[in-house]
C-alpha cells in the first residue's frame, strides 16, 4: 500500500518530506554511508530468515537488496513518510521483487501488519523514535521464537561520525541502558568501523 500524502510522525521525530525523501537517495554517494549499507546488507543476508520487516525503511534500498539476495524470503518495509513508501514501492517494481516486498505506511508506534517475523530491524532510524522502550517491548511480541530485533546505528567512534549531531549517534552504553529499562536482554552488540548493531532475541 503506497502512502496517501498523510505522514505518521509524532512530535519530536525528524520528518522526511518530498524533497528530503528524494534527496536521501544521494546518501549512497558518501563513502561512509556506502560502508554502512554494505555492513548492514552483508550482516542481514548472513542470517536465516523467511519473513523480515524493516521499520523506518526509508527509500527501501536496504530491504530491496536483502530480499533480492534471498529468493525464499518475503519482506515488509514500513515508514512514516508517504514519499519514502512510494520510492520504496517503485524500487521493488523496478527490481522485479514487488511480489515479495511490500512497503506501507507505519512507524515504530503503529505497525500495520499482523503475523510473526524471523527478523525485524532498523537502520539509522532507531535514534529518531519516540518512546523507544515501549517500541522495543511491542516489537518483541511480533517475533517468532528465537526471532531477532536488530538495531543498526552509527556510533560516536570514527572521525566522520564525530562530526554528526550527537543525537544521531548511539553507543554500547545506550543499548545496555535500554535493555535495563525494558527488561529485554541483549543477545549481542557488534561494533564495526564506526557502526554498531545491537541484537535482542525473543527467547
Predicted segments with their positions:
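Short conserved loop adjoining the S-adenosyl-L-methionine
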Residues: 110-114
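A short glycine-rich, Lys/Arg-flanked "PGG" loop and its adjoining helix->strand segment in the class I
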Residues: 134-145
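A conserved beta-strand element that flanks and buttresses the S-adenosyl-L-methionine
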Residues: 121
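Class I SAM-dependent methyltransferase Rossmann-like catalytic core
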Residues: 18-32
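Conserved alpha-helix/loop element of class I SAM-dependent methyltransferases that forms part
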Residues: 31-48
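N-terminal, positively charged/glycine-rich alpha-helical extensions of SAM-dependent methyltransferases
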Residues: 1-21
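Class I SAM-dependent methyltransferase SAM/SAH-binding core
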Residues: 53-55, 59-108
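C-terminal alpha-helical "lid/dimerization" subdomain adjacent to the S-adenosyl-L-methionine
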Residues: 27, 150-199
Amino acid at each position: 500500500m503506497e502512502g496517501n500524502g498523510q505522514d505518521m510522525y509524532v512530535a519530536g521525530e525528524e520528518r522526511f518530506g518530498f524533497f528530503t525523501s528524494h534527496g536521501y537517495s544521494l546518501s549512497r554517494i558518501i563513502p561512509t554511508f556506502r560502508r554502512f549499507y554494505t555492513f548492514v546488507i552483508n550482516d542481514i543476508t548472513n542470517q536465516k530468515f523467511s519473513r523480515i520487516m524493516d521499520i523506518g525503511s526509508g527509500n527501501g534500498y536496504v530491504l530491496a537488496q536483502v530480499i533480492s539476495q534471498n529468493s525464499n524470503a518475503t519482506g515488509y518495509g514500513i515508514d512514516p513518510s508517504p514519499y519514502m513508501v512510494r520510492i520504496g514501492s517503485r524500487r521493488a517494481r523496478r527490481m522485479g521483487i514487488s511480489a515479495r516486498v511490500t512497503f506501507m505506511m507505519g512507524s515504530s508506534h503503529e505497525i500495520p501488519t499482523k503475523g510473526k517475523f524471523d527478523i525485524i530491524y532498523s537502520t539509522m532510524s532507531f535514534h529518531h523514535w519516540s518512546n523507544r522502550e515501549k517500541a522495543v517491548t511491542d516489537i518483541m511480541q511480533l517475533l517468532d521464537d528465537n526471532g531477532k530485533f536488530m538495531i543498526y546505528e552509527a556510533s560516536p567512534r570514527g572521525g566522520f561520525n564525530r562530526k554528526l549531531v550527537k543525537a544521531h549517534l548511539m553507543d554500547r552504553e545506550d543499548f545496555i541502558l535500554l535493555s535495563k529499562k525494558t527488561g529485554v536482554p541483549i543477545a549481542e552488540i557488534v561494533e564495526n568501523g564506526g557502526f554498531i548493531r545491537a541484537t535482542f532475541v525473543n527467547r
